[in-house]
Amino acid sequence: KHGSINCRLPPERGPCRGNITKYYYHNESRTCRTFSYGGCEGNSNNFRNRHYCMKYCARKRHGWLGTGWI
């Protein structure tokens, strides 16, 4: 599953009407930011918390930032 994560995709709410706070990796700032997820579909740049977002995107794509969790 984690091999298919694309950290370069923009956040995608999806067609459902939920309001779930999730995290996505923002490539330009190399940080994880929150967005409102509808609850279904969307894309793989979608994480339940900042820890997993940084784990799968910042370290994998850019190496450890050296500043701790952002």
From Swiss-Prot:
Expressed by the venom gland. One of its GO terms (cellular component) is extracellular space. PROSITE patterns: BPTI_KUNITZ_1 (PS00280), BPTI_KUNITZ_2 (PS50279). Signal peptide: none annotated. Coiled coil: none annotated. GO terms for biological process: envenomation resulting in negative regulation of voltage-gated potassium channel activity in another organism. It is found in: Secreted. Residues 7-57 form the BPTI/Kunitz inhibitor domain. It holds the Pfam family Kunitz_BPTI. GO terms for molecular function: potassium channel regulator activity; serine-type endopeptidase inhibitor activity; toxin activity. Disulfide bonds join C7-C57, C16-C40, C32-C53. The record marks R17, G18 as: Reactive bond for trypsin. Keywords: Disulfide bond, Protease inhibitor, Secreted, Serine protease inhibitor. Belongs to the venom Kunitz-type family. Scorpion delta-Ktx subfamily. Delta-Ktx 1 sub-subfamily. Negative results: has no effect on chymotrypsin and elastase. Shows weak inhibitory activity on mKv1.3/KCNA3 potassium channel. PANTHER family: BPTI_KUNITZ INHIBITOR DOMAIN-CONTAINING PROTEIN (PTHR10083:SF374), KUNITZ-TYPE PROTEASE INHIBITOR-RELATED (PTHR10083). Serine protease inhibitor that inhibits 85% of the activity of trypsin at a molar ratio of 4:1 (Ki=760 nM). This is Kunitz-type serine protease inhibitor BmKTT-3. It comes from Olivierus martensii.
